[in-house]
Amino acid sequence: LNDSANTTRMPGKYYTLEEAKELVAFCKAHHMTLIPEIDMPGHSAAFIRTFRHDMQSPEGMKILKLLMDEVCETFDVPYLHIGTDEVQFTNPRFVPEMVSYVRSKGKKVISWNPGWHYKPGEIDMTQLWSYRGKAQKGIPAIDSRFHYLNHFDTFGDIIALYNSRIYNKEQGSEDLAGTILAIWNDRLVSTEWGMIIENNFYPNMLAMAERAW
């Protein structure tokens, strides 16, 4: 997966296992919750190029479980995000089986909404990414629907973020877990620092924090 031949953006850019562990330690020292995301089964073209198997195939699921073993061992954190957005599901067993497997490793599981449709108890938390995403009673939701930064979108305007309300509610609840401000560079930015600058990350982060306290 780390081979530059299998990636289309920023070849050779990845975290080593030691760097990943250092990042976990840094976040803990600064009282932040790190949530690793391993996109499945969508946004996984590099997986297919590397292993020559679709994630939803029996062979792909075997490989993915081995990767989850390594991820769960490397990241000493409570949550793991599994994606499940923007994909056609061809294997109805895929998501339930992967959620169960990650939970068996002692992790709570987060999934995008819209994505796979869960009932209470089938997932630990969802993250709303589109106006079509709806919080479900009994499943805590993170509201990121209009709280993401992309220098081609207007949602990340600092004034709009400051004046927004998380899920249009005055305060959180057992079903509303807050917000995450995400940088989604659908248009390629050449460097990591360029992403921070072009998306006006720090001012926007502070504005959104005022809504989330």
Per-region residue spans from a language model:
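Beta-rich nucleic-acid/ligand-interaction surfaces
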Residues: 1, 116-121
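Substrate-binding cleft of carbohydrate-active enzyme catalytic domains
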Residues: 1-105
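Structural preference for beta-strand elements that scaffold enzyme active sites
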Residues: 31-35, 79-81, 108-110, 123-127, ...
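Active-site-proximal loop/turn and secondary-structure-junction residues that shape catalytic pockets
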Residues: 38-44, 86-88, 115-117, 130-132, ...
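Structural recognition of alpha->loop->beta junctions
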Residues: 53, 69, 75-78, 121-126, ...
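Generic recognition of flexible, low-complexity loop/linker segments
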Residues: 69-71, 115, 167-169
